[in-house]
Curated annotation (Swiss-Prot):
Predominant place of localization: membrane
Region of interest (Atypical EGF-like), residue spans: 283-340
Catalytic activity: L-seryl-[protein] + ATP = O-phospho-L-seryl-[protein] + ADP + H(+); L-threonyl-[protein] + ATP = O-phospho-L-threonyl-[protein] + ADP + H(+)
Topology versus the membrane: Single-pass type I membrane protein
Alphabetized SUPFAM superfamilies for the sequence: Protein kinase-like (PK-like)
Name assigned to this protein: Wall-associated receptor kinase-like 3
Tissues showing expression: Preferentially expressed in roots and flowers.
InterPro entries the UniProt entry points to: EGF_Ca-bd_CS (IPR018097), Kinase-like_dom_sf (IPR011009), Prot_kinase_dom (IPR000719), Ser/Thr_kinase_AS (IPR008271), WAK (IPR013695), WAK-like (IPR045274)
Species annotation: Arabidopsis thaliana
Gene: WAKL3
Amino acid sequence: MKTKTYNFRYIVASVLTLLMNGSSAATPPNSNSSSSCNRTFGGISIPFPFGIGGKDCYLNSWYEVVCNSTTSGSCKTVPFLTRINREVVNISLPKSDFFSPYGVVHIKGPVTSLGCSSNISQGLQKTLPDLNITGRGSPYFLTDENRLVAVGCGTKALMTDIESEILGCESSCKDTKSNEVGNSLCNGYKCCQARLPVERPQAVGVNIESNNDTRGEGCKAAFLTSMKYFPSNITKPEWFQADGYAVVELGWYFDTSDSRFRNPLGCTNLTRSSGSYFLTDICLCRYGYFSRMSYRSCYCGSGYRGNPYIRGGCIDIDECEVPNKCGEDTCVNMAGRYSCVPKITKPAKLAHVLRGVLIGLLGLLFFVIGIFGLYKFIRKRRRIIRSMKFFKRNGGLLLKQQLTTKDGSVEMSKIFSSRELEKATDNFSIDRVLGQGGQGTVYKRMLVDGSIVAVKRSKVVDEDKMEEFINEIVLLSQINHRNIVKLLGCCLETEVPILVYEYIPNGDLFKRLHDEYDDYMMTWEVRLRIAVEIAGALSYMHSAASFPIFHRDIKTTNILLDEKYRAKISDFGTSRSVATDQTHLTTLVAGTFGYMDPEYFLSSQYTHKSDVYSFGVVLVELITGEKPMSRVRSEEGIGLATYFLEAMKENRAVDIIDIRIKDESKQVMAVAKLARRCLNRKGNKRPNMREVSIKLERIRSSPKDLDVHTENEEEEEEDQLMEINRIYDS
């Protein structure tokens, strides 16, 4: 029955405690460290959650401390806990170990005496009212440090709760050596003690009953006290009765499970299974279960001291303040701990400083290298993205597809990277320029494999004709003729496409013919060989290639000379291929005045005979050494072709032959006759390039068997001259 009663009362008290603490925890203790709160008086420290003063100085009324009104308002000696009406001896916070999971407050408790007064009829006397720590929200409980003590001969002490449940001890009057007064133990002789039950009561009273020992008369005293404050070698009850009180130890705690209270503290939540928390945490709170009471208490971690129940209340302990903490070594205080560092001599100190400087410089160096590497990476990434964008826009994917589907073409051409060509041309430096034309700029440079190439960078690109442009690249990459400049590859990763050709060292034919060179190499034999080579190359393009190709811009500036003055046709910027069943192309007029076919100029229909006409103008240049357009003839309204045909008509062709080749007039006149046929106004009356090539080969190989008599074609030539003059005059 006793156990059931305790259990029921304990459960009710615990529930009330949780309810009260839950309500008080709703508001974090934000202002408890206010300067208006007095934290000491009477030499006693009053840490939060206890407090004196306004309501913000303590957690709730259970922790309120006031001064005893009986002392005329003085708060120096008698601080009281108002809710239990007890004078405070001292207050301590929970210690940082699992064996002290609660705080402690020592109070003054009553002393019950019997027979100590001159007026024996007074019976039992109590110096103070019985202790009662019950009530809604009470955080207090009796700790197991307390004992029920009875002092005096034959004293029978009884401890009762509100319902008079009895627990006690009885002292003896037998004087034996084992029970000598001086043995400092309260073990039965004139003094006995009893432990409190596991289920400690919240309200207690102490009574004294007499036993049958005749020697038990006299002064008797009984009280509840903390054994820390009990002088066990004193067995005179008068002493305790005169003192008027005994020190009782109360444990206290409050529930911080509500995160609204715990989180503002900044404490770490722990359980018994927590590991090495004390090495790193400043403030800790833990949940526990003690004497059927659930609690949560907070404390400062290892290396810290102070009050964990206020934010920032745990302060680092400076262990180095202890003398000789590290012996001869240097003590260095750290957060929550300390370290002993061997003393550094001057050389070692200098080395240490130098080491620190070196580490700093290395760190700075690595930082700079890292930033530079990141910059290079971002720049490279942007360049790759930009190159891929241009590659797709310039038809790179289509070119790759076509190169891989055509037999052998992959080996005959190459797709260069923009990085490779930028490096080869010093980022397209002006110092590397070979020449500039209407289609773009040509640069000379050596590739990584040591080969010298000509890099042509286009000026503009027509995106609508990109597919046609890619088809032409594929086609030109398959041309393999000794008198045609070889297209080595291209680069499509730039804003405008770049073409890479084989490098031809001796420049173009135009400069060799018309600039003031002391060039003894431009003999008639060389000129005739150049004509034969160009005619053969054009014949190959018109008939022998996979698809007929019309150059559309045959002129002496597009005829290059290698180191042995062998001719090579270049600049296919306006070239077009046609299907084998096509006879002409209808395009916008493109070409160079002075070389342009008048029939193409009027009809916009370009045929292979248009290339024949342009080649005829080149033959006239080789014969006369004249430019296709000159200031004198321009004022007269005629070009080189008209000028030549007039001279042929008037039988004065010899007069316009270049003075440097007049000694070869017979061969020259044979070529002049062929040139006149190439310049026929009607394209269908012109020879094709195969016929022209065969005729030139015959002239070159059989110079003695030439028939150079001019045929009577005056009427037809009259028509030609009139038509040509009309075109150029317009």
